[in-house]
Amino acid sequence: MSKRDTMIRALCKSLGVDYRVTTIDLERVIYRDFGNGFNVEISGMHTSSMKKKATIYLWYGDTMTECIIVKTVRDIPRELIGENVEELMKYSNLLIAQGYDSYDKLFRLKYGKTINYAGGVKNMTHRIF
């Protein structure tokens, strides 16, 4: 096992049993499913450097066609990853409490509206990927 693999597994273990190491978009990342439709991807930690900072993505959805990045938090030191993930879980619960509990609602929150790219065909909207 490489030093990078050892480091990411140790970090994952330190975060707790709710986390796991997996591959997303060809990158080894740490993942946590909140169980409420939201999940987090902790990117940038498959490294042998203790100084490398993480990027944490809050996602909604679990299938390729129904996923959206809701929030991105950058430059998080290793020792603050767990705290930031807990804040994102609180944020996800707040979104749900405010009615943002579907891909379409979160898309409209993030981008302002659903955009019609159908050349003027009434009521035909397409998502941007």
Q: Which stretches of residues belong to each language-model region?
A:
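A short acidic-to-branched-hydrophobic micro-motif
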Residues: 40-44
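Negatively charged, low-complexity tracts enriched in Asp/Glu with abundant Ser/Thr
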Residues: 1-37, 53, 59-129
